């Protein structure tokens, strides 16, 4: 069997009920009851579907419906039945005379569920707070590291020796670098002075050409074939012979120079 078409395809009304529709529904149910909700709208002369008539009767038009707030006993009963039945609101409403499933569902979502969630959230916060209190354990690690035993004197002495040796090696390197730079500068100065002196005293070819081209007329350099070349006396030789003549008394016979 197929499902009956919805209200829109059959031209039925939807939306809020009017007071006239409520009176027609109540009068029909009081006379004939509500054995078949699907056939009831046609029998009562209402342009409504069977589901809409049933919900209107159960939730609003029943004469035994309780109005007002739920008592403490009713709320405890709803909580207990919800733990057993879950969201079966019609079954829960059957255990509570005068209360509709719609009212029970509304009071559950607006009040009772929040009341039950508050302690759970508090426990969750407490659990998270307990975890936060456990975090300082990690803070003990730096303290343990700080409380480690100090280094032995031998290690400290060896470290100081190594540091001093490194410092001395660095100083020696700097000293050697300074000495090498100073020696390099001295060599450069000597080379520059040598080059300047060589440039000052450099004799070119013109000097020798001028010397060789000088005339020899003024010099009596005639030599006989048998004579040997005698070097001219030097100043030391002249002083020597002059001293000899002075001692022998023959210096008076020498001509005046």
Curated annotation (Swiss-Prot):
SUPFAM superfamilies: Homeodomain-like. Residues 9-61, 62-116 form the HTH myb-type domain. It is found in: Nucleus. Its main location: nucleus. Residues 141-170 have a biased composition (Low complexity). One of its GO terms (molecular function) is DNA binding. Residues 130-140 have a biased composition (Basic residues). Pfam families: Myb_DNA-binding (PF00249). This is Transcription factor MYB4. It comes from Oryza sativa subsp. japonica (Rice). The gene is MYB4.
